[in-house]
Regions:
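Outer-membrane beta-barrel porins/channels
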Residues: 1-245
Length: 245
């Protein structure tokens, strides 16, 4: 269990470079989120040993409480997310058509872990740099109002992979995790199609989203082990209904 809180700041601006044109340029910078967190965990190991004389199983229980004076094992730490940079372009034609595009960059290898006294963690930070990389995100969308109350929408979103090809699950010798499998997700593509209605008191939106991405699956870490290619696809339909008073 992890509890805590964090704070970040966002700065941005929108510029219209041409006075008589609806074309606009937007830029924004999101600072890292600075988290102060506390982790609590406990472990229980139960072992059954056959007793052939009594034909029964003897049970042995080892509980982490036995080593931590009856309390959860835990510690305080700090976590800092990467900076995020965004550039957007937008254009409207009259009151019936609008199109916009965005580019976003965030380097996940720059995330940082430290103890409550500020000392950098010696395992988590090098592992993040070794396994993760910068992510490029592109978004583009358009809306066409057939009539003032009814609109068609179309969108596309591309997000590059956050994991390097050589990434693996680096379980420490004292890890409480029992799962060894892992999958390195590749680029993600999202396609959306929607319609919307805006009345004086009632509004409705209906959207369909199709997402697909590939990943390399490994049951455990072994340099000689061949990957399994997996393709993930998902379809989603979303509807919003509302009333204005």
């Amino acid at each position: 269990k992890i509890d805590g809180s964090g704070v970040d700041f966002k700065f941005g601006a929108i510029v219209r470079p041409f006075e008589d044109s609806p074309f606009r340029i937007g830029v924004s910078v999101h600072t890292p989120t600075f988290y102060n967190l506390k982790i609590k965990t406990n472990v229980r190991a139960v072992t059954y040993t056959p007793d052939f004389d009594s034909k029964k199983l003897s049970e042995a229980v080892v509980d982490s409480y036995d080593f931590t004076n009856g309390v959860d094992y835990g510690y305080d730490f700090r976590f800092r997310t990467p900076w995020k940079y965004n550039l957007s372009l937008g254009y409207t034609y009259g009151s019936s058509f609008a199109i916009g595009a965005e580019y976003e960059y965030q380097d996940y290898s720059a995330m940082h872990f430290s103890y409550s006294d500020g000392e950098a963690m010696g395992w988590q930070n090098p592992t993040a740099k070794e396994m993760l990389k910068g992510v490029n995100t592109f978004r583009i969308g358009a809306e066409w109002k057939v009539i003032p109350q009814f609109a068609f929408r179309l969108g596309y979103n591309y997000m590059s992979a956050a994991f390097k090809k050589t990434a693996f699950k680096d379980l420490s010798y004292n890890s409480i995790n029992t799962d060894t499998d892992f999958a390195n997700a590749k680029a993600n593509n999202n396609y959306t199609l929607g319609i919307g209605y805006r009345g004086s008191t009632f509004y409705a939106d209906l959207a369909y989203m199709y997402s697909t991405y590939k990943e390399d699956f490994y049951p455990f870490d072994d340099g000689a082990l061949k990957k399994t290619d997996v393709t993930n696809s998902r379809s989603k339909v979303m509807m919003t209904l509302g009333l204005r008073f």
